[in-house]
Amino acid sequence: VTKEPRDAPQFYLTSPAPCPYLPDRLERKVFTHLIGLRAPSLNSALTLAGFRRSQTIGYRPACEDCRACVSVRVKAAEFSASRTHRRILKKNQYISSHTQPKHATHEQFQLFRRYLSARHADGGMADMGMGDFQMMVEDSHVDTRIIEYRLKSGPNACEKLVACCLTDRLSDGLSMVYSFYDPDLEEHSLGAFMILDHISRAACEDLPHLYLGYYVSGSRKMSYKARYLPQERLGLEGWSRFDA
């Protein structure tokens, strides 16, 4: 009998729970632990297979009667900014981005709390405290960092933290794990700006892909991911290219 290697990942299945994307649906997830020296390579391999990361857990939807969640990755080097994207970049030309180590700060946490209160007050993360936020950022065995976005309002003004993104570096791209921004700057489209910045970062690092997570047909809050082209979506026969 062939024995499984002792360090091979073990996969588990969650119990059914309400779907966060589509009403009146239940979701299940398959998950494994991303720990130890193999965690970075396993994270890359699992992301390629449609998984996402949350702290030391890699997970993927495993719903019995639904395949609405589709992994999406942007072709970074081939990306062509639309007129809307160019307007967003111009509007945010005074915002600078800074790569920081995976260390949670109180400044980041205060912005995170304001974002949740304004955008996801009824969500599962609404009650997170500083300790929970610190775990989200720092509890990781993979190659991750937090990218800060700061706006300088004047020649002598301090740069104000307006957005953050927890980002993984994979063997074939960058993965945006979680992002949040100042809800008072709605006109700046900071969520879109962070995606555009990450596409540029991936291309500059000669990484072919930016992983955006799941595109969910029928979910308004996930539909924006279809706007970044060209992109590939993961189906039963592998990754398929979409140019429109």
Question: PLM features: residue spans?
Answer:
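A short pocket-lining beta-strand/turn micro-motif at the edge of beta-sheets
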Residues: D172, E186, E205-L210, K221
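Active-site catalytic microenvironments for nucleophilic, acid-base chemistry
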Residues: A118, D197, R201-E205
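Residue-level preference for non-acidic, small/hydrophobic
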Residues: L46, F112, I195-H198, K225
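Active-site/acyl-donor-binding loops of N-acyltransferases
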Residues: R60-P61, V70-A77, H209-A244
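Conserved acetyl-CoA-binding loop-helix of GNAT-fold acetyltransferases
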Residues: E187-S200
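Intrinsically disordered, low-complexity, positively biased terminal segments
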Residues: V1-T84, K90-Q93, Q100
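A conserved beta-strand-loop-helix scaffold within acyl/acetyltransferase catalytic domains
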Residues: R52, I57-D65, V72-E187, R227
